[in-house]
Structure formats: C-alpha cells, structure tokens
C-alpha cells in the first residue's frame, strides 16, 4: 500500500471508557484482513513515562521489548495483535516537551520564540508519523489519552486537527463516547455524546466514526438521532455494548462492519472478511469451559483492578487454553498472617506472588510462600516474588534468620538479594532500572526448561536488585536450584525447588510476553500443575 493511513481514537464524556480496547480491536480486524498495523498511545501527563507512577495512580506499568516503561494500554495492543511494541508506541507530554526543550538548547529553532503552536504540535506530529515513515505499516492507529475538554489534551487535539487537514483521506478520527442509561426514566440519554462531539468540533475536528459505549443495546432510532445531531453518517455510528470479556469487542465491532467503514473512508477496497478463526476458537474455549482452576494472586495492590493487569490476563489466557475457567482470588499481602494463612490459601490450586517494590506487604508474601512450600502448593514468583522465594528459603531452610533484600534492610549479615553492581552509581529514579528483554539460559532437565520446551528464552525485566551469587552454592546444596541465568553476566534469573510439585520463581516478567494467540509457556505450565494439584486433592 502506497500511503500509510492514520486513525486517531479520542474519547469523550468520561475517562476509562476503553479507548485502548477499541483501538486494539480495530487494529486486530485490520490485521486480520492482511494489513500491517501499528498502535500507539499519547498520554497527556507531564511525566516522561509512567515508570515512577504509583499503581494506585496509573495502574500497571508495562515494559516494552526495547526497555521502555509504558502505559498499560500497550499490553492490550500486544495481546490483541501479537506484535511487540517499542518506545515509539507510547509518547507523553513530558517526552514531547523534553524533546522540544532539548532542540531549543541546541539552537535548532534558530532564535525563534518556542511556542505550543507550531513547535509542540510539530513535535507531536513528528512522533505520530514516526511509525508510518518506517514504511512497514499500512495503518497507524493512535489513541489520544484523556477526555476531550481536558486542558492537557489540547495540544494533541490541535495536532490531530492539523494532520486531518494535511493527510486528507489518509486520516480519520474515531470518537468514543458514553451513552448513559437513566434507570429512573427507563431510557438512554444521548445528550452527553452530542456535547462531547460539539467540544471536538470546537477544536476543529469532525469525527468520522462514533463508537457509543453503553450498558444496553441501542435502538436504530437512537443511532439515527446521534448521527443526525453529530453530523456523522448513520453507518458510521457503532455501538459497543458491555460484554463479558474484552476479547469479544473485535467481534462486536466486526458485526457492525466498522472495519469495512474504515476501509471505505480511507479509499481502500473492502476485500474478503477478516480471518479470525483462532480468535473465535479462543472465545469458544472460554465459553465452553466448565471446570474451574482457582489461583491466588498475592500482592499489595490487589484492590486496584489494573495494578497487575498483564498477570491477570496471562493467567486467564493460560486457563482457557487448558480448557478451564479462571477463578482469580486477590489476596492482599499486608493482611496475610501466620494465624490466617492456612484459611486464606487452603482452597487454592496454586498461588502467584506478585512483583512490586518496597517493604510494604513483603512479610505477608513470605508467610504465604512458607505455607505454599510446606504444603506443596504450586507457586510462581515473579520479580520481587522470586526474590521473596529466595528470602523465605534462606530463613526457613538454610537457617539465615536475618536474610533479606537490601532494598528493605541493608544492616544485615545475609544479603541474599542485593543491589546490582551497575545500579550502585545510579542516582535518577526514572528509566534507570534493568529494563527490557534479556536472554536467559535454562538448566537442562529443570521444570522451567520443560515449561518452555527449550534451553534459551528471552524475557523482559524491570528491577534493580538481584540474587546474590555468593549464596548460590549454599542454596543449591539446600535444595533450591538456580535454573536460569543470563549467559553474558551470570545473573541468576530463575530458581526452583525440585522437591516440590511446582515452586518456581523468575526475575523476569513473563506476563509481558503472553498474548491471545500465543500464551506464555510459563503460565501454561503453571496452570497445568495447578489443575493436577486440584485433581490429586479431589482423589
């Protein structure tokens, strides 16, 4: 295809409507038609990236293959399209301003007064076009974070306005709004959508397609009314009714021919219907699963739905491919005690010890790990979860009662988890961890190697602290094996206890490499062991 097509997804009325899911779903439909699709997210906050944001503020921090800390929507993009993202797929206001100020300091603006228009907007447009200029993508779908009317979003919307003018038919705007149902009146209200579109029009953007989020199916007369008052063709008004799982959204949009509407508007032939066989099979497995596997996720942010989003989705995908429903039980690690751990975990088929930072909730994780190990409950530790496995084993098996990570306590004898050497001179907090994909050599014959079916893997990381290799021999003799290491540095990446059914910890984040059509083998193996445990306990 000669020219890259650019699609912008904006949102109105309220936030958290699911712009990322709509963007990913549309991208999936276009990809299924044979097009190469890139998805990117523009976030209007002034942070350079979300790496230093509290999960309570922003949910999960996603990590890309090339080591960029990114918005959790990039996780949706990868899970839907099964293609990796990079630093170029997530841009913030902070990044834009940082680039512009750096150019100003270098004298690239030749003494001109640096302003929002044109300098900030030009930098935004440059980043929008960056992926398209690589000439490998037919479509670039850009999600604009925030809600129309937010002051933070204005430079991005102005950039979209300019691009729609410059690109002509090669550019269109999809606007997602909310149509509330008023129970007292027994009817839906379209006025918020009308006002949202009016706000968009006031900044010079006429949406080409409207997607209406709603709890109840909208009647044709409502859709026609929205089309009339929002200046949009009737066949360009799409409704997105609440569905049991986000993975049904592509099919909901396909049933209303949204992908065909997009193709016609950008001047392309509609062609054959998308090839969605594997997607349908995935949903069929989900809907027909009868038995349940129950997994406890032990972490300190579990009350926030998006804090461990990629882990939640990876477990769900693995359960579905193992023909089971996932019953995920959130266990707040701060509330786990010696007195209640047995009651809390006794009905679990397996537990996952979540990643994180800091001391809060760590003791609860250690108590949960001791119970799981002693009761042979399948356990997967991720990042800090693996480090907690090492600490628990050191205290209760090796007898190192003061064992800890120096992230929490440095004035101890047994520093079984310590700051990485290359991190000891780092002073900045943002973007300075060990980030991105690294190779890991797996020990032949280990449970981890069996899970992956190979002896070398490449997974993503986000950490500053590591297993202290001075203790490696002591752990090996005591029964905890170091079964994964970086082939270049010797850094221990994974541990397991062979005497247990499944007691495996990994320093990396396998959840960032798990998609709808390609679930991560580690989660698949963990869920299989949990299912076996469930069956054995029933016998």
UniProtKB/Swiss-Prot annotation:
Catalytic activity: UTP + L-glutamine + ATP + H2O = CTP + L-glutamate + ADP + phosphate + 2 H(+); L-glutamine + H2O = L-glutamate + NH4(+); UTP + NH4(+) + ATP = CTP + ADP + phosphate + 2 H(+)
Annotated binding of Mg(2+), by residue: 73, 143
Name of the coding gene: pyrG
Active site, renumbered: 383, 509, 511
Enzyme Commission number, as recorded: 6.3.4.2
Name by which UniProt lists this protein: CTP synthase
Span list, region Amidoligase domain: 1-268
Gene3D superfamilies, sorted: 3.40.50.880, P-loop containing nucleotide triphosphate hydrolases
PANTHER family: CTP SYNTHASE (PTHR11550), CTP SYNTHASE-RELATED (PTHR11550:SF0)
Binding-site residues for ATP, renumbered to this chain: 16-21, 73
Keyword Magnesium among UniProt keywords: yes
Presence of the UniProt keyword Nucleotide-binding in the record: yes
A biological process from GO: 'de novo' CTP biosynthetic process
Cellular component GO terms held in the UniProt record: cytosol
Domain of life assignment: Bacteria
InterPro entries xrefs: Class_I_gatase-like, CTP_synthase, CTP_synthase_N, GATASE, GATase1_CTP_Synthase, P-loop_NTPase
Start and end residues of each Glutamine amidotransferase type-1 domain: 294-536
Family annotation (HAMAP family): PyrG
Binding site for L-glutamine: 56, 356, 384-387, 407, 464
Known function: Catalyzes the ATP-dependent amination of UTP to CTP with either L-glutamine or ammonia as the source of nitrogen. Regulates intracellular CTP levels through interactions with the four ribonucleotide triphosphates.
More details: CTPSs have evolved a hybrid strategy for distinguishing between UTP and CTP. The overlapping regions of the product feedback inhibitory and substrate sites recognize a common feature in both compounds, the triphosphate moiety. To differentiate isosteric substrate and product pyrimidine rings, an additional pocket far from the expected kinase/ligase catalytic site, specifically recognizes the cytosine and ribose portions of the product inhibitor.
GO terms assigned for molecular function: ATP binding; CTP synthase activity; glutaminase activity; identical protein binding; metal ion binding
Residues that, per the record, bind CTP: 15, 150-152, 189-194, 225
Family according to the record: Belongs to the CTP synthase family.
């Amino acid at each position: 295809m000669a020219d890259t097509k650019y699609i912008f997804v904006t949102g109105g009325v309220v936030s958290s409507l699911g712009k990322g899911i709509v963007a990913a779903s549309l991208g999936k439909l276009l990809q299924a038609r044979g097009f190469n699709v890139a998805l990117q997210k523009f976030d209007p906050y002034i942070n350079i990236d979300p790496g230093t944001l509290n999960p309570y503020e922003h949910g999960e921090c996603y990590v890309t293959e090339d080591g960029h800390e990114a918005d959790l929507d990039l996780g949706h993009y990868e899970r839907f399209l099964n293609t990796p993202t990079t630093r170029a797929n997530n841009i913030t206001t902070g990044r834009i301003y940082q680039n512009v100020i750096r150019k100003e300091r270098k004298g690239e603006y030749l003494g001109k007064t640096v302003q929002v228009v044109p300098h900030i907007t030009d930098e935004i447009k440059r980043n929008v076009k960056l992926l398209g200029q690589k000439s490998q993508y037919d479509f670039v779908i850009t999600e604009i974070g925030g809600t129309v009317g937010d002051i933070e979003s204005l430079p991005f919307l102005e950039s979209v306005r300019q691009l729609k003018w410059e690109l002509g038919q090669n550019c269109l705007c999809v606007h997602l709004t909310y149509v509330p149902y008023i129970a007292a009146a027994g009817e839906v209200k379209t006025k918020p959508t009308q006002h949202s579109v009016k706000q968009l029009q006031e900044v010079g953007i006429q949406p080409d397609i409207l997607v209406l989020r709603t709890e109840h199916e909208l009647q044709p007369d409502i859709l026609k009314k929205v089309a009339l008052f929002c200046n949009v063709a009737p066949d360009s008004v799409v409704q997105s009714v609440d569905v049991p799982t986000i993975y049904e959204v592509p099919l909901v949009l396909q049933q209303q021919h949204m992908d065909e509407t997009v193709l016609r508007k950008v001047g392309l032939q509609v062609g054959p219907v998308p090839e969605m066989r594997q997607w349908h099979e995935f949903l069929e497995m989900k809907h027909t699963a009868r038995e349940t596997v129950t997994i406890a996720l032990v972490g300190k942010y579990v009350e926030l739905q998006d804090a461990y989003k990629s882990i939640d989705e990876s477990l769900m995908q693995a359960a579905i491919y193992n023909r089971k429903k996932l019953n995920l039980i959130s266990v707040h690690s701060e509330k786990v005690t010696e007195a209640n751990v047995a009651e809390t975990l006794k009905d679990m088929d397996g537990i996952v010890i979540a990643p994180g930072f800091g001391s809060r909730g760590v003791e609860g994780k250690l108590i949960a790990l001791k119970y799981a190990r002693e009761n042979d409950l399948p356990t997967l530790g991720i990042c800090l979860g693996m480090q907690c496995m090492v600490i628990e084993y050191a205290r209760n098996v090796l007898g190192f009662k003061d064992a800890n990570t120096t992230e929490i306590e440095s004035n101890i004898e047994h520093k079984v988890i310590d700051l990485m050497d290359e991190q000891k001179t780092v002073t900045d907090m943002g973007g300075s961890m060990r980030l991105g994909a690294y190779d890991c050599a797996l020990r032949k014959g280990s449970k981890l190697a069996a899970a992956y079916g190979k002896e070398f893997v490449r997974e993503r990381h986000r950490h500053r602290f590591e297993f202290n290799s001075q203790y490696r021999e002591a752990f090996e003799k005591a029964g905890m094996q170091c079964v994964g290491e970086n082939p270049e540095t010797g850094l221990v990446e994974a541990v397991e206890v062979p005497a247990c059914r499944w007691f495996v910890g990994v320093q990396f984040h396998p959840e960032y490499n798990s998609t709808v059509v390609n679930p991560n083998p580690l989660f698949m193996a963990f869920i299989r062991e949990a299912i076996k445990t469930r069956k054995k306990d029933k016998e």
